[in-house]
Amino acid sequence: MNTKFLLSSDNNNRNELLKKKIIHYYIANGDATIADLGREMDLSIPTVTKLVAELQDDGYILDFGKQETNGGRKPNIYGLNPASGYFVGVDMLKDKLNIAAIDFKGDKVQLEENIPYQLENTPASLEQFCKIIDDFIVSLPVEQNKILAIGVNITGRVNPASGYSYSIFYFEEKPLAQILEERLQTKVFIENDSRAMTYGEYMKGVVQGEKNILFVNMAWGLGLGIIIDGNLYYGKSGFSGEFGHFCMFENEVLCHCGKKGCLETEASGSAFHRILIERYREGSNTILAGKLDSGEEISLGDLLEAVRKEDVLCIDILEKMGVNLGKGIAGLMNIFNPELVILGGTLSLAGEYISLPIKSAIRKYSLNLVNQDTEIKISN
């Protein structure tokens, strides 16, 4: 099976580029006839027929037989062969990993969530990361040589084109993607976590035809994914979307980026954690008092569970964070005039406790015409 054209970034070979576009069409739209493809791609029927035949020979496309029609000659319908290849996706969080495998049509084959893992910028943490992925691949009910690629979502500054990560695992001179490929013996692509989540929503989530989208990733940190005219926006070096580092506050809180006053210092999971400790020390009460007194680690999950149990302190902190986030998002909306803003990430699981103050602040601080143009949804 020819896999080189799928993983190549060379767009000079027209034949291979068109094959990739055909596969992308099937991923986005499902099964289709030769005529459908020709119409959508503005190609002649003979050209499409030739390309589809080559993809059939390579095992990527299947002929599903005649399509039912009301009359005339019945055309054959074609679609992706789910068993022609598999992909593994890895979601890297502060204290756990989520790993999934999908087939060539994008259907889930296997999912493992909340795998314990401590993210640190050390060779030992990187080795543990690779070991967990190795173990997952071995457990799959497919041949390992059928794994075409591994996608890794990484927080912070990532350049997918060069394969470099500048926020985590940057202790070697080689690109992180290359290091992972050598260790895992499979093609690896790295991507910023917020952008990856944005694309996931665009392909399989709450997006319903919108082409100009902002995805706000509210987790331990704060990130942003941007889609303009149906395409992910990267910026010059792949560093777009650092929403959490808007300078919005005159505080003395040092952000992990090394600067003070970042939005992330007052409106993120890490801010939630810090403010809870500060307020508790000042005398406020919380159902997390036992953990705070014992010095036990408090996770984002613990904070959200306290909110669900109607902990007054945690709800108050979250509401204030929502207002700050809403102000920032209102500014983004005034700049980008998006059709859709998606609220996602772990903090979005707080539901209306965070979404209502965000929406209220957006209405207050965004331009009315822009606000009326934009729909706000919670990620599913």
Where in this protein do the model-derived segments appear?
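ATP-binding/phosphotransfer module of carbohydrate and carboxylate kinases, centering on a glycine-rich
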Residues: M1-F64, T69-G72, I77-E113, Q118-N145, ...
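Short glycine-aspartate micro-motif
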Residues: F87-D91, I147-G151, I213-N217, G223-G225
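Hydrophobic beta-strand positions
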Residues: A101, R157-V158, I226
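Residue-level signal for well-ordered, solvent-exposed loop/turn and beta-edge residues enriched
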Residues: D107-K108, Y164, N231
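Glycine/GP-enriched mid-protein hinge/lid loop-to-helix segment characteristic of carbohydrate kinases
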Residues: L111-E113, N121-S125, E181-K309
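Glycine-rich phosphate-binding loop and adjoining helix at the ATP-binding site
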Residues: L111-N212, Y353-R363
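Short glycine-rich anion-binding loops that position phosphate/pyrophosphate groups of nucleotides
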Residues: T155-R157, W220-G221, L347
